[in-house]
């Protein structure tokens, strides 16, 4: 799967869209294996870039998901409660995790080329 060039990426394998949507990268979901549960943050919670805010559990492991930007959680992907496998099948579309009202982007976000270079 090609890494979308319209997104920004954290070295910890999260992506951030222009509208504040956050998910994990295709590389991350491949490393995790089959996702069986996603623990999402509470809507309204204030988060800081780099803070652990969610957990993705797979058959292999559980992995913390970090906020790629500071802001307030304004939505979570309710679809994941019944369909956590969306994180595997559509990491950049239906498998998004939460949306932020961004107050400040993380200073170390990468473009697609830089992310691909460090992820592989």
UniProtKB/Swiss-Prot annotation:
GO biological process annotation, one example: glycine decarboxylation via glycine cleavage system
GO cellular component, one term: glycine cleavage complex
Residue stretches making up the Lipoyl-binding domain: 19-101
Keyword Cytoplasm found: no
Keywords: Lipoyl
Cofactor requirements of the protein: (R)-lipoate
Gene3D superfamilies for this protein: 2.40.50.100
Modified residues (N6-lipoyllysine): 60
Free-text remark on how the cofactor is bound: Binds 1 lipoyl cofactor covalently.
Cited function: The glycine cleavage system catalyzes the degradation of glycine. The H protein shuttles the methylamine group of glycine from the P protein to the T protein.
Family the entry assigns: Belongs to the GcvH family.
Subunit record text: The glycine cleavage system is composed of four proteins: P, T, L and H.
UniProt protein name: Glycine cleavage system H protein
Gene giving rise to this polypeptide: gcvH
């Amino acid at each position: 799967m090609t890494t979308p060039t319209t997104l920004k990426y954290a070295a910890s394998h999260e992506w951030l869209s222009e509208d504040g949507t956050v998910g994990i990268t295709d590389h991350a979901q491949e490393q995790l294996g089959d996702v069986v549960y996603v623990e999402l943050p509470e809507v309204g919670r204030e988060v800081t870039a780099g803070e652990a805010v969610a957990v993705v559990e797979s058959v292999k492991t559980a992995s913390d998901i970090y906020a790629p930007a500071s802001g307030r959680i304004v939505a979570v992907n309710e679809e994941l409660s019944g369909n956590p496998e969306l994180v595997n099948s559509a990491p950049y579309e239906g498998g998004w995790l939460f949306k932020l009202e961004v107050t400040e982007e993380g200073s170390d976000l990468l473009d697609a080329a830089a992310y691909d270079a460090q992820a592989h």
